[in-house]
Amino acid sequence: MAEEQKTSKVDVESPAVLAPAKEPTPAPVEVADEKIHNPPPVESKALAVVEKPIEEHTPKKASSGSADRDVILADLEKEKKTSFIKAWEESEKSKAENRAQKKISDVHAWENSKKAAVEAQLRKIEEKLEKKKAQYGEKMKNKVAAIHKLAEEKRAMVEAKKGEELLKAEEMGAKYRATGVVPKATCGCF
């Protein structure tokens, strides 16, 4: 008899606990689905307009606590997904920005190294040109010195010849004076 009372108590208690939980749960989900899925108007066939479903915020009823909880959990899950997607999007944007910045940095480094190489090449060419200029300058100075030396030698020869001619003229003049002979004119005009 005690077992029958326990089973009857269990039978009485279990439907009372389970019955309210089963009935409110399907109703709010169906209502929420009906609110979210609005059929597009017939006129929208002509226009390609994308409409976001408008969620109507109705005051929540105090009597259906389980339904409110389901709606809140659904909203919370939706917000969680949205925030995750937004965080992912921001992360991807940040990664893309970092990759682009790194590539730009690499391009700057490449440009700077190439510029430095070209400038080094230019300096090397300038040094070679300076050396050649110095060498040619030295050669030209040597040529000028050689020309000056030759000119001095030629001047010396001219001076020597002049001295010889003067000496010869003096000797001839002395000879003509001593002999009393008048020299012949060297010019054939007279």
Curated annotation (Swiss-Prot):
Region (Disordered): 1-45, 50-69
Induction, as annotated: 10-fold by auxin, 2-fold by gibberellic acid and not by cytokinin.
Pfam families per UniProt: Remorin_C, Remorin_N
Presence of the UniProt keyword Ribonucleoprotein in the record: no
Residues bearing PTM Phosphothreonine: T58
Biased composition, class Basic and acidic residues, residue ranges: 1-12
Tissue: Expressed in roots, leaves, stems, flowers and siliques, with a maximal expression in apical regions.
Phosphoserine: modified positions: S14
UniProt GO cellular component terms: cytosol; plasma membrane; plasmodesma
Biological processes annotated in GO: defense response to virus; membrane raft localization; response to salicylic acid
The entry's keywords: Coiled coil, Phosphoprotein
Subunit structure: May polymerize to form filamentous structures.
Family named by the database record: Belongs to the remorin family.
Protein name from the UniProt record: Remorin
Organism: Arabidopsis thaliana
Chain's gene name: DBP
